[in-house]
């Protein structure tokens, strides 16, 4: 079977080597490639996938919402979220799923067992944030707070969340047990920190869904303050494993996947 990940930019993605490690561990003769598709060329997505005979693919920034009009169906979870990170192509039909939130929460519970009672702030209101918000709403009792620079970004949100501006969030940081950055700030060469951490409580866990670099600027800042930190590696591995199960019905070798990603990250350092 042939799989892929689409995004822009995509050169930093470790999805191909991670999935290849899983294929080899399971003795499968599958392939997985990264496809850089700029927004201006996205209308060609059907032709591109047909030409490459792709059976399923992942979607990353900035296409998680852009893909929706091209789908024939979405599962109930993805419909609630309104963002897609996984597409299965079956008998010519494109079916959309979202495994981001599931993957993130699986890992978060390992580092924050008392997740049910946590007060959580998400930073960013893009497609990735929607996926996490849906899963965190199910996992935690408190109403989730989501902060974004542009409030109009919430106009197409159907999820029950408390919305606030970045400025409001900065002042209220001390009220949260977990703060999660879902924006691209800090990814690869981007050294931005989207929110000041001056009012952060001492024990608040600061997380970032980015895994390249291993410690983003916001995580370094939090660590310097003595706060616990958690990056996006487990989410990356777990969402990939969930996608693989959707495509094939098989359980992925997450140990092989994670070890391969860690090796690649060490080489980049």
Swiss-Prot record:
The keyword NADP applies. GO terms for molecular function: NADP binding; shikimate 3-dehydrogenase (NADP+) activity. It catalyses: shikimate + NADP(+) = 3-dehydroshikimate + NADPH + H(+). Belongs to the shikimate dehydrogenase family. Coiled coil: none annotated. It holds the Pfam family Shikimate_dh_N. One of its GO terms (biological process) is chorismate biosynthetic process. NADP(+) binds at residues 124-128, 148-153, 209, 232. Homodimer. Pathway: Metabolic intermediate biosynthesis; chorismate biosynthesis; chorismate from D-erythrose 4-phosphate and phosphoenolpyruvate: step 4/7. Keywords: Amino-acid biosynthesis, Aromatic amino acid biosynthesis, NADP, Oxidoreductase. This is Shikimate dehydrogenase (NADP(+)). The active site is at residue 64. Involved in the biosynthesis of the chorismate, which leads to the biosynthesis of aromatic amino acids. Catalyzes the reversible NADPH linked reduction of 3-dehydroshikimate (DHSA) to yield shikimate (SA). InterPro entries: Aminoacid_DH-like_N_sf, NAD(P)-bd_dom_sf, SDH_C, Shikimate_DH, Shikimate_DH-bd_N, Shikimate_DH_fam, Shikm_DH/Glu-tRNA_Rdtase. PANTHER family: BIFUNCTIONAL 3-DEHYDROQUINATE DEHYDRATASE_SHIKIMATE DEHYDROGENASE, CHLOROPLASTIC, SHIKIMATE DEHYDROGENASE. Its EC number is 1.1.1.25. GO terms for cellular component: cytosol. It comes from the Bacteria. It comes from Staphylococcus carnosus (strain TM300). Shikimate binds at residues 13-15, 60, 85, 100, 211. HAMAP family: Shikimate_DH_AroE (MF_00222).
């Amino acid at each position: 079977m042939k799989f892929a990940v689409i995004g822009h930019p995509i050169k930093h993605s470790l999805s191909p080597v991670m999935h290849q490690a899983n294929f080899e561990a399971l003795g499968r003769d599958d392939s997985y490639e990264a496809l850089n598709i700029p927004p201006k060329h996205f209308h060609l997505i059907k032709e591109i996938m047909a030409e490459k005979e792709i059976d399923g693919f992942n979607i990353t920034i900035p296409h998680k919402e852009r893909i929706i009009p091209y789908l024939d169906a979405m599962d109930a979870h993805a419909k609630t979220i309104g963002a897609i990170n996984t597409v299965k192509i079956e008998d010519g039909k494109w079916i959309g799923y979202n495994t981001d939130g599931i993957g993130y929460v699986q890992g978060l519970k390992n580092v924050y067992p008392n997740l049910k009672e946590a007060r959580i702030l998400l930073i960013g209101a893009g497609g990735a944030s929607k996926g996490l918000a849906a899963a965190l709403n199910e996992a935690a009792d408190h109403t989730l707070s989501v902060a974004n620079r542009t409030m109009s970004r919430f106009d197409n949100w159907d999820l029950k969340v408390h919305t606030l501006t970045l400025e409001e969030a900065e002042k209220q940081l001390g009220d949260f047990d977990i703060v999660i950055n879902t924006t691209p700030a800090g990814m690869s060469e981007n050294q931005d920190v989207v929110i000041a951490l001056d009012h952060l409580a001492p024990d608040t866990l600061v997380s970032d869904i980015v895994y390249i670099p291993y410690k983003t600027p916001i995580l370094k800042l939090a660590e310097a303050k003595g706060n616990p930190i958690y990056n996006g590696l487990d989410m990356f591995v777990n969402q990939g494993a969930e996608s693989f199960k959707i495509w094939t019905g098989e359980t992925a070798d997450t140990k092989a996947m994670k070890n391969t990603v860690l090796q690649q990250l060490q080489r980049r350092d």
